[in-house]
């Protein structure tokens, strides 16, 4: 099912509850989006649906409204601890957002209780909250929901509570599978009743999603909603009101271009994407130091407890910058994001589309910009063909200020900045090596010297990818970087303590090594001969071109060693035999006669 149109909520064949319509008016949504007008009637007629629609198309309301309508039509009212609907979503941020949208509706229906189960919170408190207040509608991430099904100690029997389940929703299904939640979802499905309505929502249809459809849905109606005015054969995967741009610049120009761009738009709201958590940590601190009048927040997947708070804070801001990884790339609806900036291209092409989709949400306008290195220019055509995502070039700004010396000065003044920069560089190189588009993003073509200058490094890090390479275009600082202190006095004190401990250990180890060297000569010699014999055997097995006279010498030495070990000859005789063997080989070599010729 593809050809659907927008329309008024009142035009639905199955009428909505007056209080649902009232909540929609409060939210400022007088009309349905195509995905909503296609999905809601089917869901309400007890059909399983598998919906594919571009990011920012209004998928959340497409399942929130049917959940409420189906629960309102139940013959038997839900008790406090009976679960009528479950929404599973891949990230905490998306779960928080869905819970917030749902609360706009449930406040009009006090008979329904809702509960949010996500990581970063105390699971014991979640259990107590459910026991006290109930949870007719659960919004959860897969890991926490699976954990709740397995909990027995706190007196929670969730398996019994879900026997009344009417609706299951799997939101961002492709991301659920990409993030490795397949096993958790399968476990959860085993606990749920078969007689239920299931909705699967996704921005892309992959083979893995298709497998999940077969496993979790019964005779589903498939919905694929396209952007208006675009031919089916070339369906654009980003919102039609999104302006996509790219900028080609060298690795050591990129940061200056980014700061110039952000300074010229300080009153706007931006998302800045980096490829790794370490890059977010480093460049987030750098931007804080250089854009003092702008509110800057950082968020990434390794933040366990701060993420929820940071996400909510940024949503409330009128202007500011959120520096983030792909943890913010899917489904998140942040009000009035003006620009999505991709400092690093994502590891796969579909993530590019999802990043861009954080702006131009539900009919609003928005813009996106990706920074590319000269060697990555082919990525533009790749996106146009592979993701149906055309991009327009944005000219390089020529009047930018070089801020890299300031970053270097920050690293020299504080070891924390120096270490963050080194970690960020290493993590970026490692992520680059794993890029899905390896024909375009080739590690061997990367300008490591320019990249190091762009990261404002004081010296090149030691890492396998740089081993054996020379960097004449990179000038390291002329100081011992081990002498750079932490600004934080407590951290510096701990560092000095560790350095002293290492010095002592090194000194003790050197003493032990000297003692080991004073072993009996005969034992050392025997060990050396064993090693020699093993190497000779290995070379022979590998088809080595070792000549016959060397092999004969080795065999003679081995025979002597065996006799010496068995006590058949003395140490003096052993040494004499080795010398005789070596002398004989030299003489024969000088004469040009091999051992085999003499023996014959």
Curated annotation (Swiss-Prot):
Domain Helicase ATP-binding positions: 40-223
Top-level EC class: hydrolase
Bias (Basic and acidic residues): 499-513
Matches recorded under Pfam families: CTE_SPB4 (PF13959), DEAD (PF00270), Helicase_C (PF00271)
EC number: 3.6.4.13
Basic residues: compositionally biased ranges: 514-538
Stretches the record annotates as Important for nuclear localization: 533-562
Keywords recorded for this protein, A-Z: ATP-binding, Helicase, Hydrolase, Nucleotide-binding, Nucleus, Phosphoprotein, Ribosome biogenesis, RNA-binding, rRNA processing, rRNA-binding
Reaction(s) this enzyme catalyzes, per UniProt: ATP + H2O = ADP + phosphate + H(+)
Phosphoserine found at: 544, 594
GO cellular component: cytosol; nucleolus; nucleoplasm
Region spans: Disordered: 499-551
Helicase C-terminal domain residues: 254-402
Keyword rRNA-binding belongs to the record: yes
Compartment(s) where it occurs, according to its Swiss-Prot or TrEMBL record: Nucleus, Nucleoplasm
Binding of ATP, residues: 53-60
Extent of motif DEAD box: 171-174
Entry-linked InterPro entries: DEAD/DEAH_box_helicase_dom, Helicase_ATP-bd, Helicase_C-like, P-loop_NTPase, RNA-helicase_DEAD-box_CS, RNA_helicase_DEAD_Q_motif, SPB4-like_CTE
Function (record text): Probable ATP-binding RNA helicase. Has ATPase activity and is involved in the maturation of precursor large subunit rRNAs.
Entry remark concerning the domains of this protein: The Q motif is unique to and characteristic of the DEAD box family of RNA helicases and controls ATP binding and hydrolysis. The C-terminal region is required for DDX55 nuclear import and association with pre-ribosomal complexes.
Family: Belongs to the DEAD box helicase family. DDX55/SPB4 subfamily.
Record note on quaternary structure: Interacts with 28S rRNA. Interacts with double-stranded RNA substrates in vitro; the interaction stimulates ATPase activity.
Name this protein carries in UniProt: ATP-dependent RNA helicase DDX55
Organism, as annotated: Mus musculus
Gene that encodes it: Ddx55
